[in-house]
Amino acid sequence: MEIRKKPNIFTVLVIDFSSKPSMALLLAILLFLSGPSASAVAAAAVGPATGFKPADDILIDCGSKSSSKTPDGRVFKSDQETIQYIEAKEDIQVSAPPSDKVASPIYLTARIFREEATYKFHLTRPGWHWVRLHFLAFPNDKFDLQQATFSVLTEKYVLLHNFKISNNNNDSQAAVQKEYLVNMTDAQFALRFRPMKSSAAFINAIEVVSAPDELISDSGTALFPVIGFSGLSDYAYQSVYRVNVGGPLIMPQNDTLGRTWIPDKEFLKDENLAKDVKTTPSAIKYPPEVTPLIAPQTVYATAVEMANSLTIDPNFNVSWNFPSNPSFNYLIRLHFCDIVSKSLNDLYFNVYINGKTAISGLDLSTVAGNLAAPYYKDIVVNATLMGPELQVQIGPMGEDTGTKNAILNGVEVLKMSNSVNSLDGEFGVDGRTTGMGKHGMVATAGFVMMFGAFIGLGAMVYKWKKRPQDWQKRNSFSSWLLPIHAGDSTFMTSKGGSQKSNFYNSTLGLGRYFSLSELQEATKNFEASQIIGVGGFGNVYIGTLDDGTKVAVKRGNPQSEQGITEFQTEIQMLSKLRHRHLVSLIGYCDENSEMILVYEFMSNGPFRDHLYGKNLAPLTWKQRLEICIGSARGLHYLHTGTAQGIIHRDVKSTNILLDEALVAKVADFGLSKDVAFGQNHVSTAVKGSFGYLDPEYFRRQQLTDKSDVYSFGVVLLEALCARPAINPQLPREQVNLAEWAMQWKRKGLLEKIIDPHLAGTINPESMKKFAEAAEKCLEDYGVDRPTMGDVLWNLEYALQLQEAFTQGKAEETENAKPDVVTPGSVPVSDPSPITPSVTTNEAATVPVPAKVEENSGTAVDEHSGTAMFTQFANLNGR
């Protein structure tokens, strides 16, 4: 937040939230500057404030020989009174003539540094602190302050980099206030002023003031996809805008924390669509979870609603545009309070930021618990979604959900420190640039998720130790297996197998029952060297059975509730699924409360390992197509091959496993969900893997088979580009594979980013068809995405185009050789049912496969990668 003020030669105070301050704002400020009586009128207009006593309240009037009292009643100490804070080889004190029209006496003096100077403050209590820096470049005979260029740094953060007031301001003679919110973890806080070579640094006043810990919680919501975001306390913030929507200017003495709130009119895109509403501040009642320190009653007592929302077409949004820096992430705090409804549960609306849905179907009655009850929401907007302006919009829901209206009471826009802990520019305190940063938003989210997992694990350990004595009886592995499928699968008992185990085995069709000793022997007593995978359930080991068969042994961790839940789900799913392109369950073990599942061993491991990261021989384009086709068959079977469709919910390249012949099989059904007959979605908490998650699933928390389609689209791009879905080490625009690849696709230059190993080997038409399939999978809305059957059809066609291309090149090569007749040679007919007619290797005539019918039960040859798939795989399984 910047505050500009003019003394005698600079006559007005301007709060610089944009380049065009409104007339209402200027009038309110002039009232404030006119004297105590006017201030009292302004205070009465906005109402009383709830006080907060900061542990640290350091106010310095730099360059002053005596203390100064500001119009809001605060006292700033002089240089002599604060000499213990400053470390400087030399400094120059300058002043301007006194004037009754100066906004505040702190702008009449300044301190100038020609070399680096440091203020060191000993804090009473570490934690969140406001840091406010005041600047005004008034004329003096020592130095032209308008040309001063300098940086301001803390031990960890860059607050200002090569700051020059004439560049920062449309009016270089106006005062500027920079406001920051920093979480100080040490008892000492250092503030360094570093002038540029042959220049100087200056400062008029400094504030270091404690802020309440609850002002910034550690968690919020990330935008697009909408997902929980943790770690907000790890950032520093610059207050850029603080807006009282639909209300007047609120001066510091009328705010609960001495903040300034400006009116919203200069940011409102179309005033004709907005209507101001208000109530008395005393009508605002804070719920227990919202402290009055978040925002005063006067913010929540005013709002903007949709103009004429009851009489005109309500299908419009009210928009506010805020100039911003697209190089930074932003924390947007939105304030809501339902002061327009006459009854509960009558107002539902959507909130959008930069065109993306930030909050869908906001029901203030539910989240706030009452009418006139404050509620706020923190939204983190990644720099990849930023432009020169930040846009906030409110609008009604597009369905019959009560009154067609939407409201907003307040907006705060805070710039977040970047990957090198800078709030201004790309250089960190240690000279690193953002290009060298080791973490960004995605990496931070990943770290926080891992940290949360450790916290959850600790809670589970505590719960495990406190378990009742009869826990084992009530929670044996077999006890929670539900008799889902009374199949007729044959089974074998192991040596010493119990009747109880055989009963569950035959009921569930789980295959062979293994004793614990058998699996210990098979895995060398679960030796660490045998681990081939790790998940929330526990470890996966490679094992060798008595007959030499290699298996994958998944051993559950009883201390992980997530693992138990996923085990239950996986057993329920696998007990009724049999398909060539789904990993098969061989058997299980529940001895001594163990939770162990035994699967067929996939010797070539995850698909991802063959694309990047493992230095394995690169796959050909045909091999990649066949693997994608096999995976698509498996997913299509899940969606349509059972009475109840199944949504995998965690489709990714590590969950597509390859056997010794590179046949693809979909694995890991721990997050899968059944879809009841007649339903097209499942309302459920958002789960999955970052980078693959369906954005619509995030927004609506409604899981559909199109969520799998979206994730599979990301897998297709991995196959084409041979890089991870998310890579935080890359430049910002390349972090997300789906977004990056689609940008190149729209430019018609996708071939520029494909795996270099594929260069010159792909038929352009095959790649075009493949890329079109991926693009359709990645549509924002599920209704616009194809079914897995449609995806499979397109992949089959891409494969046929590639095979025709390859055959055409082979024929050209053969025709270029001299004719040689080999005695006894006999022409061999092509066993493939497709005989492409190749005119040239540029354009091969390929029969288009018949469209896949979603519920076709006719079997075709699943073993041939060259067969023309006019019908679908046997959905009855085998």
UniProtKB/Swiss-Prot annotation:
GO CC, alphabetical: apical plasma membrane; chloroplast
InterPro entries: Kinase-like_dom_sf, Malectin-like_Carb-bd_dom, Prot_kinase_dom, Protein_kinase_ATP_BS, Ser-Thr/Tyr_kinase_cat_dom, Ser/Thr_kinase_AS
Signal peptide span: 1-43
Membrane topology field: Single-pass membrane protein
Listed transmembrane segments: 441-461
An example Gene Ontology biological process: regulation of pollen tube growth
Chain sites annotated for binding ATP: 532-540, 554
Active-site residues per Swiss-Prot or TrEMBL entry: 650 (proton acceptor)
Protein's UniProt name: Probable receptor-like protein kinase At4g39110
EC numbers on record: 2.7.11.-
Extracellular domain ranges by topology: 44-440
Cytoplasmic topological segments: 462-878
Keyword Cell cycle set for record: no
Organism: Arabidopsis thaliana
Entry's family note: Belongs to the protein kinase superfamily. Ser/Thr protein kinase family.
Alphabetized UniProt keyword annotations: ATP-binding, Glycoprotein, Kinase, Membrane, Nucleotide-binding, Serine/threonine-protein kinase, Signal, Transferase, Transmembrane, Transmembrane helix
